[in-house]
Amino acid sequence: MIELFVIKETEWLELVTESVSLEGQRYQAPRSITAKIITKQGTHSYYSVSEGDTVLFKWKGKELFRGIVFSRNPEEHWMTFTAYDMLQYLVKNKDVYVFSNQRADEIIKRLARDFQIPTTSIANTGYTIKSLVFKDDTSLYDMILKALKQTKSQTGRNYQLYSAKGKLGLRAWPDLSEVWVLETGVNITGYQYSTSINDTATKVKLRRQKDNKTYTATASDSSGISKYGVLQYVETVSDNINQAQLQERAKVKQAQKKGVKKELKSIQAIGIPDLQSGLPIYISIPEVGVKKTYWIDTDKHEFKGSTHTMTIDVVEKNSIPDGVSS
């Protein structure tokens, strides 16, 4: 059952709640809830919330979220509000910084200290970053992601920012040793699955201009050409690379763009409270030949009365998306 509280200095006040939506996205801080509460019934008024209040959400006695109210939509008898966890302060705050000879965890602690963000356990990331400079105003979140990205490139280890009981933390990314299973006929209630060759390339051509000369490199998928015809992808490369590197890049690009593209999304299922973006999940949908482990990219949990449902999107690899702190 839903338990939603507003936390005051000396007490927790329970809110009369109709529904709660809890959601998050991998590498997109923070997690949030949107709740609909009853504030008035007849002549009787119930507890409400204001911007800046701390709210706590429990489901069947287990805390799933604690965060700060950032927006409200009050009506005559009810109110909808949205609250964010502590990672919101990493997104909202920007500044310029120069870090020298510091680990990613030390950078996190410094930023948290400077911006008065309470912390819980911060894992030692091990690798010392020689220099990290942000000359333009940059969000604290992007600074940290860049530090974590450099750490992964040097150590191969992934780390995850999280918020627990109103405090910012850092932990090693959960591994694949134990995963939840979603399966049609058991707990999956719906999904969208599609296949397409709209973005497939059976031939890749890369060009590079240098000293008024054009250098080209090509790679092709002969079996793909036989099956789908010639579908050529062309790109002009601006990097300062030699012919051998250009050819290697063409081969890599061809490998990325070959074959039928398969997309699995909007997986609807019976709710599992522990599932959230960034976690591994094994999905079995024999009807379309899917039996493998994915990573949860987005999650949205809906709670109403005694019912809990969820919708997730998944990705095959837990890599930092292009354009994120690159």
UniProtKB/Swiss-Prot annotation:
InterPro entries: Bact_Kbp, YQBQ-like_dom. It comes from the Bacteria. It holds the Pfam family YQBQ. To B.subtilis XkdQ. This is Uncharacterized protein YqbQ. It comes from Bacillus subtilis (strain 168). The gene is yqbQ.
